[in-house]
Amino acid sequence: MKHIRNFSIIAHIDHGKSTLSDRLIQVCGGLSDREMAEQVLDSMDLERERGITIKAQSVTLDYTAKDGQTYQLNFIDTPGHVDFAYEVSRSLAACEGALLVVDAGQGVEAQTLANCYTAIEMDLEVVPILNKIDLPAAEPERVAEEIEDIVGIDAIDAVRCSAKTGVGVDEVLEKIVSAIPAPQGDPDAPLQALIIDSWFDNYLGVVSLVRIKNGSLKKNDKIKVMSTGQTWGVDRLGIFTPKQVDTDSLDTGEVGWVVCGIKDIMGAPVGDTLTLAKNGCEKALPGFKKVKPQVYAGLFPVSSDDYDNFRDALGKLSLNDASLFYEPETSAALGFGFRCGFLGMLHMEIIQERLEREYDLDLITTAPTVVYEVLKTNKEIVYVDSPAKLPAINDIEEIREPIARCNILVPADYLGNVITLCIEKRGTQVDMVYHGNQVALTYDIPMAEVVLDFFDRLKSTSRGYASLDYGFQRFEMSHMVRVDVLLNGDKVDALAIITHRDNSQTRGRQLVEKMKEFIPRQMFDIAIQAAIGNHIIARSTVKQLRKNVLAKCYGGDVSRKKKLLKKQKEGKKRMKQIGNVELPQEAFLAILHVGKD
Protein backbone atom coordinates (compact mmCIF):
# COMPACT_ATOMS: atom_id res chain seq x y z
CA MET A 1 0.00 0.00 0.00
CA LYS A 2 2.87 2.39 0.62
CA HIS A 3 3.64 2.17 -3.10
CA ILE A 4 0.31 3.60 -4.18
CA ARG A 5 -0.03 7.25 -5.17
CA ASN A 6 -3.44 8.74 -5.94
CA PHE A 7 -3.40 12.13 -7.58
CA SER A 8 -5.28 14.34 -9.99
CA ILE A 9 -4.27 17.21 -12.22
CA ILE A 10 -5.84 20.63 -11.78
CA ALA A 11 -5.33 23.47 -14.21
CA HIS A 12 -7.06 26.24 -16.09
CA ILE A 13 -8.58 25.56 -19.53
CA ASP A 14 -5.83 25.10 -22.15
CA HIS A 15 -2.91 24.91 -19.76
CA GLY A 16 -2.11 21.42 -20.99
CA LYS A 17 -3.69 18.97 -18.52
CA SER A 18 -4.77 16.46 -21.12
CA THR A 19 -1.47 16.60 -23.01
CA LEU A 20 0.49 16.05 -19.80
CA SER A 21 -1.69 13.07 -18.94
CA ASP A 22 -1.01 11.63 -22.42
CA ARG A 23 2.72 11.87 -21.74
CA LEU A 24 2.45 10.23 -18.32
CA ILE A 25 0.54 7.32 -19.86
CA GLN A 26 3.10 7.00 -22.64
CA VAL A 27 6.14 7.08 -20.33
CA CYS A 28 4.63 4.44 -18.05
CA GLY A 29 3.64 2.29 -21.03
CA GLY A 30 -0.10 2.24 -20.40
CA LEU A 31 -0.74 2.15 -24.14
CA SER A 32 1.45 1.08 -27.04
CA ASP A 33 2.60 3.86 -29.37
CA ARG A 34 0.11 2.66 -31.97
CA GLU A 35 -2.82 3.18 -29.61
CA MET A 36 -1.76 6.63 -28.48
CA ALA A 37 -4.29 9.17 -29.66
CA GLU A 38 -4.08 12.85 -28.85
CA GLN A 39 -5.85 13.42 -25.54
CA VAL A 40 -6.43 9.78 -24.75
CA LEU A 41 -8.57 10.53 -21.75
CA ASP A 42 -11.01 12.83 -23.51
CA SER A 43 -12.94 9.85 -24.77
CA MET A 44 -16.10 11.68 -25.83
CA ASP A 45 -16.09 12.99 -29.42
CA LEU A 46 -17.49 16.21 -28.09
CA GLU A 47 -14.52 16.64 -25.74
CA ARG A 48 -12.06 16.18 -28.58
CA GLU A 49 -13.86 18.59 -30.88
CA ARG A 50 -14.09 21.39 -28.39
CA GLY A 51 -10.71 20.57 -26.88
CA ILE A 52 -12.10 20.57 -23.36
CA THR A 53 -12.35 17.89 -20.72
CA ILE A 54 -15.90 17.33 -19.51
CA LYS A 55 -15.86 14.06 -17.59
CA ALA A 56 -13.30 13.02 -15.02
CA GLN A 57 -11.45 9.87 -16.16
CA SER A 58 -9.18 7.56 -14.23
CA VAL A 59 -6.05 5.60 -15.13
CA THR A 60 -3.83 3.20 -13.22
CA LEU A 61 -0.17 3.20 -14.26
CA ASP A 62 2.87 1.29 -13.03
CA TYR A 63 5.99 3.40 -12.71
CA THR A 64 9.45 2.14 -11.82
CA ALA A 65 11.09 4.97 -9.91
CA LYS A 66 14.80 5.80 -9.74
CA ASP A 67 15.00 4.10 -6.31
CA GLY A 68 14.20 0.80 -8.05
CA GLN A 69 10.74 0.41 -6.50
CA THR A 70 7.61 0.04 -8.63
CA TYR A 71 4.83 2.44 -7.73
CA GLN A 72 1.18 2.21 -8.68
CA LEU A 73 -0.02 5.62 -9.81
CA ASN A 74 -3.78 6.14 -9.85
CA PHE A 75 -4.43 9.27 -11.70
CA ILE A 76 -7.73 11.06 -12.26
CA ASP A 77 -8.04 13.65 -15.03
CA THR A 78 -10.29 16.60 -14.16
CA PRO A 79 -12.02 19.28 -16.23
CA GLY A 80 -10.82 22.87 -16.00
CA HIS A 81 -13.94 24.77 -16.97
CA VAL A 82 -15.92 26.63 -14.31
CA ASP A 83 -19.15 24.83 -15.26
CA PHE A 84 -17.63 21.48 -14.36
CA ALA A 85 -16.23 22.39 -10.95
CA TYR A 86 -18.27 19.61 -9.29
CA GLU A 87 -16.42 17.01 -11.37
CA VAL A 88 -13.20 18.39 -9.94
CA SER A 89 -14.33 18.20 -6.32
CA ARG A 90 -15.40 14.58 -6.87
CA SER A 91 -12.05 13.64 -8.33
CA LEU A 92 -10.15 15.36 -5.54
CA ALA A 93 -12.10 13.46 -2.88
CA ALA A 94 -10.45 10.27 -4.16
CA CYS A 95 -6.86 11.58 -4.05
CA GLU A 96 -4.08 12.43 -1.63
CA GLY A 97 -2.41 14.95 -3.87
CA ALA A 98 -2.88 17.16 -6.88
CA LEU A 99 -0.60 18.47 -9.60
CA LEU A 100 -1.22 22.16 -10.14
CA VAL A 101 -0.33 22.67 -13.80
CA VAL A 102 0.31 26.27 -14.81
CA ASP A 103 1.15 27.50 -18.30
CA ALA A 104 4.58 29.14 -18.04
CA GLY A 105 3.54 31.77 -20.58
CA GLN A 106 0.07 32.63 -19.26
CA GLY A 107 0.57 32.45 -15.51
CA VAL A 108 -2.04 31.82 -12.85
CA GLU A 109 -5.73 32.12 -13.84
CA ALA A 110 -8.90 32.35 -11.77
CA GLN A 111 -9.99 28.77 -12.40
CA THR A 112 -6.66 27.35 -11.32
CA LEU A 113 -7.00 29.31 -8.15
CA ALA A 114 -10.51 28.08 -7.38
CA ASN A 115 -9.65 24.42 -7.95
CA CYS A 116 -6.44 24.80 -6.03
CA TYR A 117 -8.27 26.15 -2.99
CA THR A 118 -10.72 23.24 -3.21
CA ALA A 119 -7.71 20.90 -3.06
CA ILE A 120 -6.13 22.73 -0.13
CA GLU A 121 -9.43 22.66 1.80
CA MET A 122 -9.50 18.87 1.35
CA ASP A 123 -5.98 18.64 2.84
CA LEU A 124 -4.34 17.50 -0.37
CA GLU A 125 -0.66 17.96 -1.12
CA VAL A 126 -0.49 20.45 -4.01
CA VAL A 127 2.53 20.06 -6.32
CA PRO A 128 3.10 23.01 -8.69
CA ILE A 129 4.28 22.22 -12.22
CA LEU A 130 5.22 24.76 -14.89
CA ASN A 131 4.14 23.49 -18.29
CA LYS A 132 4.82 24.66 -21.87
CA ILE A 133 8.40 25.79 -21.21
CA ASP A 134 9.18 25.05 -24.89
CA LEU A 135 7.21 28.13 -25.95
CA PRO A 136 9.19 31.27 -26.73
CA ALA A 137 6.84 33.29 -24.49
CA ALA A 138 7.48 31.12 -21.42
CA GLU A 139 8.77 32.92 -18.32
CA PRO A 140 9.02 30.21 -15.65
CA GLU A 141 10.72 32.46 -13.05
CA ARG A 142 8.03 35.13 -13.22
CA VAL A 143 5.24 32.55 -13.12
CA ALA A 144 6.81 30.74 -10.15
CA GLU A 145 6.78 34.05 -8.24
CA GLU A 146 3.19 34.61 -9.33
CA ILE A 147 2.15 31.21 -7.96
CA GLU A 148 3.74 32.04 -4.61
CA ASP A 149 2.21 35.50 -4.57
CA ILE A 150 -1.35 34.62 -5.60
CA VAL A 151 -1.84 30.99 -4.55
CA GLY A 152 0.53 31.05 -1.61
CA ILE A 153 2.30 27.70 -2.08
CA ASP A 154 6.04 27.20 -2.36
CA ALA A 155 7.01 27.16 -6.05
CA ILE A 156 10.75 27.95 -6.21
CA ASP A 157 11.66 24.34 -7.06
CA ALA A 158 8.53 23.67 -9.14
CA VAL A 159 9.16 21.11 -11.89
CA ARG A 160 9.57 22.74 -15.28
CA CYS A 161 8.36 20.58 -18.13
CA SER A 162 6.89 20.61 -21.60
CA ALA A 163 4.18 18.01 -22.07
CA LYS A 164 4.22 18.50 -25.82
CA THR A 165 7.91 17.73 -26.36
CA GLY A 166 8.21 15.40 -23.36
CA VAL A 167 10.93 17.43 -21.59
CA GLY A 168 10.82 17.08 -17.81
CA VAL A 169 8.08 14.43 -17.68
CA ASP A 170 10.35 12.04 -15.76
CA GLU A 171 10.96 14.72 -13.14
CA VAL A 172 7.19 15.11 -12.81
CA LEU A 173 6.83 11.38 -12.11
CA GLU A 174 9.67 11.44 -9.56
CA LYS A 175 8.06 14.43 -7.88
CA ILE A 176 4.73 12.58 -7.65
CA VAL A 177 6.43 9.66 -5.91
CA SER A 178 8.39 11.85 -3.49
CA ALA A 179 5.94 14.65 -2.69
CA ILE A 180 2.51 13.00 -2.61
CA PRO A 181 1.76 10.89 0.49
CA ALA A 182 0.67 7.23 0.28
CA PRO A 183 -3.02 6.54 1.02
CA GLN A 184 -4.20 6.05 4.60
CA GLY A 185 -6.57 3.21 5.42
CA ASP A 186 -6.85 -0.15 7.13
CA PRO A 187 -6.72 -3.23 4.85
CA ASP A 188 -8.34 -5.39 7.56
CA ALA A 189 -11.23 -3.06 8.41
CA PRO A 190 -14.69 -3.62 6.87
CA LEU A 191 -14.94 -2.47 3.25
CA GLN A 192 -15.63 1.20 2.59
CA ALA A 193 -15.58 2.29 -1.06
CA LEU A 194 -16.50 5.72 -2.35
CA ILE A 195 -18.32 5.94 -5.70
CA ILE A 196 -16.55 8.70 -7.63
CA ASP A 197 -18.45 8.35 -10.86
CA SER A 198 -20.85 6.00 -12.61
CA TRP A 199 -22.06 5.55 -16.15
CA PHE A 200 -24.47 3.29 -17.96
CA ASP A 201 -23.26 0.56 -20.26
CA ASN A 202 -25.87 -1.10 -22.47
CA TYR A 203 -24.41 -4.58 -21.85
CA LEU A 204 -23.14 -4.41 -18.28
CA GLY A 205 -25.68 -2.06 -16.67
CA VAL A 206 -24.27 0.49 -14.24
CA VAL A 207 -20.46 0.69 -14.12
CA SER A 208 -19.07 2.54 -11.09
CA LEU A 209 -15.65 4.08 -10.57
CA VAL A 210 -14.70 3.55 -6.91
CA ARG A 211 -11.89 4.45 -4.54
CA ILE A 212 -11.32 1.84 -1.80
CA LYS A 213 -10.82 3.70 1.50
CA ASN A 214 -10.72 0.70 3.88
CA GLY A 215 -10.80 -3.08 3.42
CA SER A 216 -10.73 -4.78 0.03
CA LEU A 217 -13.19 -5.77 -2.67
CA LYS A 218 -13.07 -9.15 -4.45
CA LYS A 219 -14.92 -10.81 -7.29
CA ASN A 220 -18.22 -12.46 -6.21
CA ASP A 221 -18.38 -10.47 -2.95
CA LYS A 222 -21.88 -9.53 -1.84
CA ILE A 223 -21.93 -5.76 -1.45
CA LYS A 224 -24.45 -3.27 -0.14
CA VAL A 225 -25.13 0.27 -1.37
CA MET A 226 -25.36 2.35 1.82
CA SER A 227 -27.98 4.90 0.75
CA THR A 228 -30.49 2.45 -0.76
CA GLY A 229 -29.66 -0.60 1.38
CA GLN A 230 -29.84 -2.89 -1.67
CA THR A 231 -27.37 -5.77 -1.98
CA TRP A 232 -25.65 -6.92 -5.17
CA GLY A 233 -23.09 -9.48 -6.22
CA VAL A 234 -19.87 -8.22 -7.78
CA ASP A 235 -19.69 -9.63 -11.34
CA ARG A 236 -16.51 -7.98 -12.57
CA LEU A 237 -14.02 -5.46 -11.31
CA GLY A 238 -10.75 -4.02 -12.49
CA ILE A 239 -8.72 -0.97 -13.36
CA PHE A 240 -8.28 1.35 -16.32
CA THR A 241 -4.91 1.41 -17.99
CA PRO A 242 -6.92 3.66 -20.13
CA LYS A 243 -8.37 0.32 -21.42
CA GLN A 244 -10.71 -1.57 -19.10
CA VAL A 245 -8.72 -4.44 -17.59
CA ASP A 246 -10.25 -7.10 -15.34
CA THR A 247 -8.57 -7.98 -12.03
CA ASP A 248 -9.58 -10.28 -9.17
CA SER A 249 -9.57 -7.75 -6.36
CA LEU A 250 -9.18 -4.09 -5.48
CA ASP A 251 -7.23 -3.35 -2.30
CA THR A 252 -7.12 -0.43 0.10
CA GLY A 253 -6.10 2.83 -1.54
CA GLU A 254 -6.74 1.65 -5.09
CA VAL A 255 -9.05 3.21 -7.65
CA GLY A 256 -10.93 0.93 -10.04
CA TRP A 257 -14.23 0.04 -11.65
CA VAL A 258 -16.95 -2.32 -10.45
CA VAL A 259 -19.87 -3.96 -12.26
CA CYS A 260 -22.61 -5.52 -10.14
CA GLY A 261 -25.34 -5.99 -12.70
CA ILE A 262 -27.34 -3.02 -11.41
CA LYS A 263 -29.92 -2.24 -14.07
CA ASP A 264 -31.68 0.57 -12.23
CA ILE A 265 -30.14 3.90 -13.08
CA MET A 266 -30.57 5.23 -9.55
CA GLY A 267 -29.07 2.04 -8.06
CA ALA A 268 -25.61 3.44 -7.31
CA PRO A 269 -25.66 7.21 -6.90
CA VAL A 270 -22.39 9.11 -7.15
CA GLY A 271 -20.91 10.02 -3.77
CA ASP A 272 -22.40 6.92 -2.14
CA THR A 273 -20.52 4.30 -0.11
CA LEU A 274 -20.27 0.59 -0.94
CA THR A 275 -19.67 -1.94 1.83
CA LEU A 276 -19.96 -5.70 2.32
CA ALA A 277 -23.45 -7.11 2.89
CA LYS A 278 -22.21 -9.21 5.86
CA ASN A 279 -20.39 -7.39 8.69
CA GLY A 280 -20.07 -4.18 6.68
CA CYS A 281 -18.95 -0.79 7.98
CA GLU A 282 -21.17 1.20 10.33
CA LYS A 283 -21.30 4.63 8.76
CA ALA A 284 -21.03 5.92 5.22
CA LEU A 285 -18.11 8.03 3.99
CA PRO A 286 -18.70 11.76 3.76
CA GLY A 287 -19.81 12.18 0.13
CA PHE A 288 -19.75 15.35 -1.94
CA LYS A 289 -21.80 18.43 -1.42
CA LYS A 290 -24.75 18.36 -3.81
CA VAL A 291 -24.38 21.08 -6.40
CA LYS A 292 -27.34 23.32 -7.04
CA PRO A 293 -28.11 24.06 -10.68
CA GLN A 294 -27.73 27.75 -11.53
CA VAL A 295 -29.45 27.90 -14.92
CA TYR A 296 -32.76 26.36 -15.87
CA ALA A 297 -34.19 25.83 -19.34
CA GLY A 298 -37.03 23.85 -20.86
CA LEU A 299 -36.04 21.04 -23.22
CA PHE A 300 -38.73 19.70 -25.53
CA PRO A 301 -38.53 16.97 -28.18
CA VAL A 302 -39.48 18.30 -31.62
CA SER A 303 -41.78 15.35 -32.27
CA SER A 304 -43.88 14.19 -29.33
CA ASP A 305 -43.23 10.52 -30.24
CA ASP A 306 -39.69 10.96 -28.91
CA TYR A 307 -40.88 11.79 -25.39
CA ASP A 308 -40.20 8.32 -23.94
CA ASN A 309 -36.76 8.05 -25.51
CA PHE A 310 -36.01 11.54 -24.26
CA ARG A 311 -36.98 10.55 -20.70
CA ASP A 312 -34.72 7.45 -20.80
CA ALA A 313 -31.86 9.45 -22.29
CA LEU A 314 -32.09 12.04 -19.51
CA GLY A 315 -32.07 9.25 -16.93
CA LYS A 316 -28.93 7.68 -18.36
CA LEU A 317 -27.23 11.03 -18.74
CA SER A 318 -28.02 12.14 -15.19
CA LEU A 319 -26.39 8.96 -13.88
CA ASN A 320 -23.22 10.00 -15.65
CA ASP A 321 -23.59 13.67 -14.76
CA ALA A 322 -24.62 14.07 -11.15
CA SER A 323 -25.34 17.77 -11.43
CA LEU A 324 -28.05 17.53 -14.07
CA PHE A 325 -31.50 18.14 -12.62
CA TYR A 326 -34.76 17.54 -14.47
CA GLU A 327 -38.51 17.45 -13.90
CA PRO A 328 -41.42 17.05 -16.34
CA GLU A 329 -42.96 20.23 -17.72
CA THR A 330 -45.73 20.98 -20.20
CA SER A 331 -46.01 24.03 -22.39
CA ALA A 332 -49.01 25.15 -24.42
CA ALA A 333 -46.73 25.98 -27.34
CA LEU A 334 -44.33 23.04 -27.25
CA GLY A 335 -46.17 20.13 -25.64
CA PHE A 336 -44.51 17.76 -23.16
CA GLY A 337 -40.88 18.11 -22.16
CA PHE A 338 -38.60 18.58 -19.18
CA ARG A 339 -37.40 21.53 -17.14
CA CYS A 340 -33.68 20.94 -16.72
CA GLY A 341 -31.20 22.56 -14.37
CA PHE A 342 -27.58 23.14 -15.41
CA LEU A 343 -24.45 24.60 -13.84
CA GLY A 344 -23.93 27.18 -16.56
CA MET A 345 -24.40 27.89 -20.24
CA LEU A 346 -21.54 25.67 -21.40
CA HIS A 347 -22.94 22.77 -19.39
CA MET A 348 -26.32 23.38 -21.00
CA GLU A 349 -24.86 23.36 -24.52
CA ILE A 350 -22.88 20.22 -23.82
CA ILE A 351 -25.87 18.35 -22.38
CA GLN A 352 -28.04 19.35 -25.31
CA GLU A 353 -25.39 18.26 -27.77
CA ARG A 354 -24.83 14.96 -25.98
CA LEU A 355 -28.57 14.24 -26.02
CA GLU A 356 -28.77 14.99 -29.72
CA ARG A 357 -25.68 12.95 -30.61
CA GLU A 358 -25.65 10.00 -28.29
CA TYR A 359 -29.41 9.45 -28.25
CA ASP A 360 -30.50 10.74 -31.68
CA LEU A 361 -33.00 13.30 -30.41
CA ASP A 362 -34.14 16.58 -31.95
CA LEU A 363 -34.69 19.11 -29.20
CA ILE A 364 -36.01 22.63 -28.80
CA THR A 365 -34.59 24.67 -25.93
CA THR A 366 -36.34 27.59 -24.32
CA ALA A 367 -34.50 30.63 -22.99
CA PRO A 368 -32.43 29.90 -19.89
CA THR A 369 -33.41 31.52 -16.60
CA VAL A 370 -31.94 31.50 -13.12
CA VAL A 371 -33.84 30.76 -9.90
CA TYR A 372 -35.62 33.71 -8.30
CA GLU A 373 -36.82 33.86 -4.71
CA VAL A 374 -40.31 35.40 -4.61
CA LEU A 375 -41.96 36.71 -1.45
CA LYS A 376 -45.72 36.63 -1.93
CA THR A 377 -48.15 39.03 -0.27
CA ASN A 378 -49.27 36.23 2.09
CA LYS A 379 -45.62 36.06 3.32
CA GLU A 380 -45.02 32.70 1.61
CA ILE A 381 -41.65 32.29 -0.13
CA VAL A 382 -41.52 30.42 -3.45
CA TYR A 383 -38.60 29.64 -5.75
CA VAL A 384 -39.28 30.25 -9.42
CA ASP A 385 -37.16 28.61 -12.12
CA SER A 386 -39.28 29.44 -15.14
CA PRO A 387 -41.11 32.60 -16.22
CA ALA A 388 -44.35 30.61 -16.50
CA LYS A 389 -44.27 29.82 -12.77
CA LEU A 390 -44.03 33.45 -11.69
CA PRO A 391 -47.13 34.33 -9.59
CA ALA A 392 -49.52 37.09 -10.74
CA ILE A 393 -48.12 40.61 -10.31
CA ASN A 394 -50.56 41.60 -7.55
CA ASP A 395 -49.60 38.52 -5.47
CA ILE A 396 -45.93 39.47 -5.38
CA GLU A 397 -44.48 41.51 -2.54
CA GLU A 398 -40.90 41.40 -3.81
CA ILE A 399 -38.68 39.41 -6.16
CA ARG A 400 -35.14 38.60 -5.07
CA GLU A 401 -32.58 37.65 -7.67
CA PRO A 402 -29.52 35.46 -7.09
CA ILE A 403 -26.22 37.33 -6.83
CA ALA A 404 -22.97 35.65 -7.87
CA ARG A 405 -19.61 36.44 -6.29
CA CYS A 406 -17.22 36.73 -9.24
CA ASN A 407 -13.47 36.50 -8.90
CA ILE A 408 -11.77 37.90 -11.96
CA LEU A 409 -8.04 37.85 -12.67
CA VAL A 410 -7.04 40.33 -15.36
CA PRO A 411 -3.80 41.95 -16.60
CA ALA A 412 -3.62 45.60 -15.49
CA ASP A 413 -3.79 46.86 -19.11
CA TYR A 414 -7.36 45.63 -19.52
CA LEU A 415 -8.62 46.63 -16.08
CA GLY A 416 -10.65 49.59 -17.35
CA ASN A 417 -12.55 47.55 -19.94
CA VAL A 418 -13.39 44.84 -17.44
CA ILE A 419 -14.64 47.28 -14.80
CA THR A 420 -16.84 48.98 -17.41
CA LEU A 421 -18.29 45.59 -18.35
CA CYS A 422 -18.98 44.70 -14.70
CA ILE A 423 -20.81 47.99 -14.14
CA GLU A 424 -22.86 47.48 -17.30
CA LYS A 425 -23.87 44.09 -15.89
CA ARG A 426 -25.15 45.81 -12.68
CA GLY A 427 -22.17 44.63 -10.64
CA THR A 428 -20.92 46.09 -7.36
CA GLN A 429 -17.22 46.05 -6.54
CA VAL A 430 -16.21 44.17 -3.40
CA ASP A 431 -12.44 44.08 -3.60
CA MET A 432 -9.47 44.82 -5.83
CA VAL A 433 -5.90 43.64 -5.23
CA TYR A 434 -2.78 44.09 -7.36
CA HIS A 435 -0.40 41.10 -7.72
CA GLY A 436 2.48 42.33 -9.85
CA ASN A 437 1.01 42.78 -13.32
CA GLN A 438 -2.21 40.90 -12.52
CA VAL A 439 -5.21 42.44 -10.79
CA ALA A 440 -7.61 40.32 -8.75
CA LEU A 441 -11.09 41.83 -8.91
CA THR A 442 -14.02 40.69 -6.80
CA TYR A 443 -17.48 41.74 -7.92
CA ASP A 444 -21.03 40.85 -6.93
CA ILE A 445 -22.96 40.50 -10.18
CA PRO A 446 -26.52 39.20 -10.65
CA MET A 447 -26.40 35.53 -11.67
CA ALA A 448 -28.74 36.16 -14.62
CA GLU A 449 -26.18 38.53 -16.14
CA VAL A 450 -23.27 36.17 -15.46
CA VAL A 451 -24.73 33.04 -17.02
CA LEU A 452 -26.06 34.71 -20.15
CA ASP A 453 -23.00 36.05 -21.95
CA PHE A 454 -20.71 37.55 -19.32
CA PHE A 455 -17.94 35.01 -19.92
CA ASP A 456 -17.84 35.64 -23.69
CA ARG A 457 -17.93 39.40 -23.24
CA LEU A 458 -15.21 39.27 -20.58
CA LYS A 459 -12.95 37.30 -22.91
CA SER A 460 -13.52 39.68 -25.81
CA THR A 461 -12.98 42.92 -23.84
CA SER A 462 -9.71 41.59 -22.43
CA ARG A 463 -8.50 39.86 -25.63
CA GLY A 464 -8.82 36.51 -23.88
CA TYR A 465 -6.52 37.34 -20.97
CA ALA A 466 -9.09 37.76 -18.19
CA SER A 467 -10.30 34.67 -16.40
CA LEU A 468 -13.38 34.15 -14.28
CA ASP A 469 -14.57 32.00 -11.43
CA TYR A 470 -17.98 32.47 -9.85
CA GLY A 471 -20.23 30.98 -7.20
CA PHE A 472 -23.68 31.68 -5.78
CA GLN A 473 -23.57 34.21 -2.95
CA ARG A 474 -27.08 35.24 -1.83
CA PHE A 475 -30.53 36.40 -2.91
CA GLU A 476 -31.11 40.15 -3.07
CA MET A 477 -34.24 42.28 -3.57
CA SER A 478 -34.48 43.61 -7.11
CA HIS A 479 -37.01 45.10 -9.54
CA MET A 480 -37.58 42.17 -11.86
CA VAL A 481 -40.45 41.95 -14.35
CA ARG A 482 -41.72 39.29 -16.70
CA VAL A 483 -41.78 40.22 -20.36
CA ASP A 484 -44.34 38.19 -22.33
CA VAL A 485 -44.30 37.78 -26.09
CA LEU A 486 -47.63 37.89 -27.91
CA LEU A 487 -48.17 36.70 -31.46
CA ASN A 488 -51.39 38.13 -32.91
CA GLY A 489 -52.58 38.74 -29.38
CA ASP A 490 -51.86 35.22 -28.07
CA LYS A 491 -49.22 34.71 -25.38
CA VAL A 492 -46.50 32.22 -26.24
CA ASP A 493 -45.49 30.81 -22.86
CA ALA A 494 -42.17 29.41 -24.05
CA LEU A 495 -40.90 32.84 -25.14
CA ALA A 496 -41.39 34.75 -21.87
CA ILE A 497 -38.29 36.13 -20.13
CA ILE A 498 -37.67 37.58 -16.67
CA THR A 499 -35.52 40.70 -16.75
CA HIS A 500 -34.67 43.81 -14.74
CA ARG A 501 -37.15 46.67 -15.06
CA ASP A 502 -34.42 49.10 -16.23
CA ASN A 503 -33.53 46.82 -19.13
CA SER A 504 -37.04 45.65 -19.90
CA GLN A 505 -37.79 48.24 -22.61
CA THR A 506 -34.60 47.55 -24.53
CA ARG A 507 -34.77 43.78 -24.01
CA GLY A 508 -38.41 43.79 -25.18
CA ARG A 509 -37.59 45.83 -28.27
CA GLN A 510 -34.55 43.74 -29.18
CA LEU A 511 -36.51 40.54 -28.70
CA VAL A 512 -39.35 41.68 -30.92
CA GLU A 513 -36.95 42.83 -33.65
CA LYS A 514 -35.01 39.57 -33.47
CA MET A 515 -38.21 37.50 -33.68
CA LYS A 516 -39.27 39.44 -36.76
CA GLU A 517 -36.20 38.16 -38.62
CA PHE A 518 -36.99 34.54 -37.84
CA ILE A 519 -40.74 34.24 -38.41
CA PRO A 520 -41.48 33.51 -42.06
CA ARG A 521 -43.97 35.80 -43.82
CA GLN A 522 -47.46 34.40 -44.17
CA MET A 523 -50.70 35.27 -45.93
CA PHE A 524 -51.69 37.75 -43.23
CA ASP A 525 -49.96 40.26 -40.96
CA ILE A 526 -48.38 38.85 -37.81
CA ALA A 527 -48.12 41.28 -34.92
CA ILE A 528 -45.28 40.49 -32.52
CA GLN A 529 -45.65 42.33 -29.23
CA ALA A 530 -43.72 42.42 -25.98
CA ALA A 531 -45.78 43.13 -22.87
CA ILE A 532 -45.30 43.57 -19.15
CA GLY A 533 -48.62 42.58 -17.56
CA ASN A 534 -51.20 44.31 -19.76
CA HIS A 535 -48.85 47.06 -20.83
CA ILE A 536 -47.41 46.67 -24.36
CA ILE A 537 -43.82 47.93 -24.50
CA ALA A 538 -42.76 47.05 -28.05
CA ARG A 539 -44.27 45.88 -31.31
CA SER A 540 -43.23 44.94 -34.79
CA THR A 541 -45.15 43.43 -37.67
CA VAL A 542 -44.23 40.70 -40.10
CA LYS A 543 -45.85 41.97 -43.30
CA GLN A 544 -48.23 39.73 -45.21
CA LEU A 545 -47.52 38.28 -48.61
CA ARG A 546 -50.12 39.55 -51.07
CA LYS A 547 -51.01 38.90 -54.64
CA ASN A 548 -51.23 41.90 -56.94
CA VAL A 549 -54.97 41.79 -57.71
CA LEU A 550 -54.79 44.95 -59.85
CA ALA A 551 -52.52 43.40 -62.46
CA LYS A 552 -55.38 42.72 -64.84
CA CYS A 553 -56.79 46.28 -64.71
CA TYR A 554 -55.23 48.57 -67.27
CA GLY A 555 -56.37 52.15 -67.02
CA GLY A 556 -60.04 51.90 -66.25
CA ASP A 557 -62.15 53.08 -63.38
CA VAL A 558 -60.83 53.59 -59.84
CA SER A 559 -63.98 52.05 -58.33
CA ARG A 560 -63.15 48.75 -60.05
CA LYS A 561 -59.73 48.73 -58.34
CA LYS A 562 -61.28 49.64 -54.99
CA LYS A 563 -63.70 46.75 -55.29
CA LEU A 564 -60.90 44.23 -55.95
CA LEU A 565 -58.75 45.57 -53.07
CA LYS A 566 -61.72 45.48 -50.69
CA LYS A 567 -62.45 41.89 -51.67
CA GLN A 568 -58.80 40.93 -51.01
CA LYS A 569 -58.87 42.71 -47.65
CA GLU A 570 -61.95 40.77 -46.52
CA GLY A 571 -60.32 37.50 -47.54
CA LYS A 572 -57.21 38.35 -45.53
CA LYS A 573 -59.37 39.25 -42.53
CA ARG A 574 -61.14 35.87 -42.69
CA MET A 575 -57.78 34.14 -43.01
CA LYS A 576 -56.41 35.93 -39.98
CA GLN A 577 -59.29 34.70 -37.80
CA ILE A 578 -58.53 31.06 -38.47
CA GLY A 579 -54.81 31.23 -39.31
CA ASN A 580 -52.15 30.16 -36.82
CA VAL A 581 -48.49 31.07 -36.77
CA GLU A 582 -45.77 28.46 -37.28
CA LEU A 583 -42.72 29.16 -35.12
CA PRO A 584 -39.38 27.76 -36.30
CA GLN A 585 -36.77 26.55 -33.77
CA GLU A 586 -34.58 29.61 -34.58
CA ALA A 587 -37.25 31.88 -33.15
CA PHE A 588 -36.85 30.25 -29.73
CA LEU A 589 -33.11 30.65 -29.92
CA ALA A 590 -33.54 34.32 -30.84
CA ILE A 591 -33.92 35.00 -27.14
CA LEU A 592 -30.44 33.69 -26.45
CA HIS A 593 -28.89 36.10 -28.91
CA VAL A 594 -30.71 39.23 -27.79
CA GLY A 595 -28.23 42.04 -27.34
CA LYS A 596 -25.29 40.01 -28.66
CA ASP A 597 -24.80 41.83 -31.92
From Swiss-Prot:
Membrane topology: Peripheral membrane protein
MF annotations from Gene Ontology: GTP binding; GTPase activity; guanosine tetraphosphate binding; ribosome binding; translation elongation factor activity
Domain annotation tr-type G: ranges: 2-184
UniProt-listed GO biological process terms: positive regulation of translation
Keyword GTP-binding on entry: yes
UniProt KW keywords: Cell inner membrane, Cell membrane, GTP-binding, Hydrolase, Membrane, Nucleotide-binding, Protein biosynthesis
Pfam families: EFG_C, GTP_EFTU, GTP_EFTU_D2, LepA_C
Source organism per UniProt: Vibrio cholerae serotype O1 (strain ATCC 39315 / El Tor Inaba N16961)
Main EC class the enzyme belongs to: hydrolase
Protein's UniProt name: Elongation factor 4
Highest taxon of the lineage: Bacteria
UniProt keyword Transferase present: no
EC number, as in UniProt: 3.6.5.n1
Reactions this protein catalyses: GTP + H2O = GDP + phosphate + H(+)
Cysteines joined through disulfide linkages: none
Free-text function comment from the UniProt entry: Required for accurate and efficient protein synthesis under certain stress conditions. May act as a fidelity factor of the translation reaction, by catalyzing a one-codon backward translocation of tRNAs on improperly translocated ribosomes. Back-translocation proceeds from a post-translocation (POST) complex to a pre-translocation (PRE) complex, thus giving elongation factor G a second chance to translocate the tRNAs correctly. Binds to ribosomes in a GTP-dependent manner.
Residues where GTP binds: D14, H15, G16, K17, S18, T19, N131, K132, I133, D134
Gene that this sequence comes from: lepA
Cellular component GO terms held in the UniProt record: plasma membrane
Family: Belongs to the TRAFAC class translation factor GTPase superfamily. Classic translation factor GTPase family. LepA subfamily.
Subcellular localization: Cell inner membrane
